[in-house]
């Protein structure tokens, strides 16, 4: 058996069950384990402040139970500069970004990794992400988590193999119910804590209220494919492709009963484009153009290849053909047309269980 007693691992403790069990499992494997709680957002709201304080308290309780120290660090400035500013700029441009992906790339596997190595003397960091890693021929691959329902490789595609080589993912080999069972067996306070939802810095607040604090909304027309104005939107940034609820345009005269869907944004004229029916052609794309490629092996792709792609989290894999247009731009053609391919979101590529990397969707291709 490997002697890990001199191998120091700093676990990112969020105050949730996954990171709690990660710390416990690493301890069982003989590692020298310490915890680190990251504060990435300066709360300005009482409910948010209370939630963050509760998370820290829960992380401390778990570390006390395991008999390990808990360090704390404030990355709010780095988060604002590298994640939040980008998030706002994308919304302003009419796209729908994914801040969790940026947070993993810039904070958890960059700022945290550097701090753990340089200031705390870590050999590895660990997180509660549902992914796995595998070493093959001197390379480190990122693999989907074993629990299909919880696999988080979609959110980690932008991390390079150097970072993955320095990271451990203990719960990636387990299914979620097993993780909760271990936490309960070990009497960890987080065993029945519900999974956090929503974007880390918004918490449980209403998204529209949050955005309005930072970006002034500009109301405009809601328009059909024939150019008919059928309503008013409160701001393009509040809407995303494929959205059906919250449009406020039900029960129109001369229209059938089919629901309306957002099919596009006309940024120049501040108009929201909608069409009726889940099978309306305007909702579907045969492919996409993506930029800002991040390959796990950090090697730009030079020739056309086959793989599968996800254009959003929890989506079924779509077989596709990928053609690099240059080192930072890809053209992706799906085997079957896909609904609601959304600029700003990420296209993430897979070869079976291996996550190859991904890129940001720039535009969807329509016939």
From Swiss-Prot:
ATP binds at residues 12-19, 38, 128. One of its GO terms (molecular function) is ATP binding. The active site is at residues 103, 200. Its EC number is 2.8.1.13. It is found in: Cytoplasm. Residues 150-152, 312-313 are annotated as: Interaction with tRNA. Its main location: cytoplasm. The keyword Metal-binding does not apply. GO terms for biological process: tRNA wobble position uridine thiolation. InterPro entries: MnmA-like (IPR004506), MnmA-like_C (IPR046885), MnmA-like_central (IPR046884), MnmA-like_central_sf (IPR023382), Rossmann-like_a/b/a_fold (IPR014729). Keywords: ATP-binding, Cytoplasm, Disulfide bond, Nucleotide-binding, RNA-binding, Transferase, tRNA processing, tRNA-binding. Disulfide bonds join 103-200. It catalyses: S-sulfanyl-L-cysteinyl-[protein] + uridine(34) in tRNA + AH2 + ATP = 2-thiouridine(34) in tRNA + L-cysteinyl-[protein] + A + AMP + diphosphate + H(+). Pfam families: tRNA_Me_trans, tRNA_Me_trans_C, tRNA_Me_trans_M. GO terms for cellular component: cytoplasm. Signal peptide: none annotated. Residues 98-100 are annotated as: Interaction with target base in tRNA. It is an enzyme of class 2 (transferase). The record marks 129, 345 as: Interaction with tRNA. Belongs to the MnmA/TRMU family. Catalyzes the 2-thiolation of uridine at the wobble position (U34) of tRNA, leading to the formation of s(2)U34. HAMAP family: tRNA_thiouridyl_MnmA (MF_00144). This is tRNA-specific 2-thiouridylase MnmA. The gene is mnmA.
């Amino acid at each position: 058996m490997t002697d890990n007693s001199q191998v120091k691992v700093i676990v990112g403790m969020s105050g949730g069950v996954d990171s709690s069990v990660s710390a416990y499992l690493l301890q069982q494997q003989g590692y020298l384990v310490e915890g680190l709680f990251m504060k990435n957002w300066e709360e300005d709201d009482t409910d948010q402040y209370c939630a963050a304080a509760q998370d820290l308290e829960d992380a401390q309780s778990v570390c006390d139970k395991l008999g390990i120290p808990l360090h704390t660090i404030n990355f709010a400035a780095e988060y604002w500069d590298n994640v939040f500013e980008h998030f706002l700029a994308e919304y302003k441009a009419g796209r729908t970004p994914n801040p969790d992906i940026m947070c993993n790339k810039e904070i958890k596997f960059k700022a945290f990794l550097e701090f753990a190595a340089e200031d705390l003397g870590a050999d590895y960091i660990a997180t509660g992400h549902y992914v796995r890693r595998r070493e093959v021929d001197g390379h480190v691959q990122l693999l989907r988590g074993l629990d299909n329902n919880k696999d988080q490789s979609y959110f980690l595609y932008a991390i390079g193999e150097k970072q993955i080589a320095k990271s451990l993912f203990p719960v990636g080999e387990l299914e979620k119910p097993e993780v909760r069972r271990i936490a309960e067996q070990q009497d960890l306070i987080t065993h029945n804590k519900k999974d956090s939802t929503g974007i880390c810095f918004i918490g449980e607040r209403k998204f529209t209220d949050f955005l309005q604090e930072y970006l002034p909304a500009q109301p405009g027309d809601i328009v059909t494919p024939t150019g008919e104005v059928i309503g008013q939107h409160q701001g393009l940034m509040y809407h995303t492709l494929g959205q059906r609820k919250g449009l406020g345009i039900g029960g129109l005269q001369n229209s059938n009963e089919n629901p309306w869907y957002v099919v596009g944004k006309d940024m120049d004229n501040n108009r929201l484009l909608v069409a009726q029916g889940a099978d309306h052609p305007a909702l579907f794309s045969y492919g996409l153009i993506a930029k800002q490629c991040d390959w796990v092996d950090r090697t730009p792709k030079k020739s056309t290849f086959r793989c599968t792609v996800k254009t959003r989290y929890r989506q079924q894999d779509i077989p596709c053909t990928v053609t690099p247009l240059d080192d930072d731009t890809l053209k992706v053609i799906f085997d079957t047309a896909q609904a609601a391919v959304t600029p700003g979101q990420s296209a993430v590529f897979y070869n079976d269980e291996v996550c190859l990397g991904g890129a940001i969707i720039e535009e969807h291709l329509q016939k």
